[in-house]
């Protein structure tokens, strides 16, 4: 296994651990999700280029489109929660609270 693959997997693991540890703030969760998507994008692109999968060459671009949509929805949710409650806690997203 190449050092590049190890670094990408470590980046994904660190982002995932950050998502598990800092899940109380919405902004931290969004940053960790973006780090996970970036490492998956780079890993997918490198694998497709190394194995010459010409049919799957659009997959990283499609994943980037979904990541951009996820970021837009997450930021709009962050703005809505910040304007409503004044803080970016994830616990404010619970619809069962009065």
From Swiss-Prot:
Its main location: mitochondrion. The keyword Oxidoreductase does not apply. Its EC number is 7.1.1.2. It is found in: Mitochondrion inner membrane. The keyword Transmembrane helix applies. It is a multi-pass membrane protein. GO terms for biological process: ATP synthesis coupled electron transport. It catalyses: a ubiquinone + NADH + 5 H(+)(in) = a ubiquinol + NAD(+) + 4 H(+)(out). The chain crosses the membrane at residues 2-22, 29-49, 61-81. GO terms for cellular component: mitochondrial inner membrane; respiratory chain complex I. Keywords: Electron transport, Membrane, Mitochondrion, Mitochondrion inner membrane, NAD, Respiratory chain, Translocase, Transmembrane, Transmembrane helix, Transport, Ubiquinone. Core subunit of the mitochondrial membrane respiratory chain NADH dehydrogenase (Complex I) which catalyzes electron transfer from NADH through the respiratory chain, using ubiquinone as an electron acceptor. Part of the enzyme membrane arm which is embedded in the lipid bilayer and involved in proton translocation. Core subunit of respiratory chain NADH dehydrogenase (Complex I) which is composed of 45 different subunits. PANTHER family: NADH-UBIQUINONE OXIDOREDUCTASE CHAIN 4L (PTHR11434:SF0), NADH-UBIQUINONE OXIDOREDUCTASE SUBUNIT ND4L (PTHR11434). Belongs to the complex I subunit 4L family. This is NADH-ubiquinone oxidoreductase chain 4L. It comes from Galemys pyrenaicus. The gene is MT-ND4L.
């Amino acid at each position: 296994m190449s050092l590049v693959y190890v670094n990408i997997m470590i980046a994904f693991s660190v982002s995932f651990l950050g998502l598990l540890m800092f899940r109380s703030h919405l902004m931290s969760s969004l940053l960790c999700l973006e780090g996970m998507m970036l490492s998956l994008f780079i890993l997918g692109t490198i694998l497709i280029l190394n194995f010459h999968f010409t049919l799957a060459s659009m997959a990283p671009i499609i994943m980037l489109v979904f990541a951009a949509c996820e970021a837009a929805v997450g930021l709009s949710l962050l703005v809505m929660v910040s304007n409503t409650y004044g803080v970016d806690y994830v616990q404010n997203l619970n619809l069962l609270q009065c």
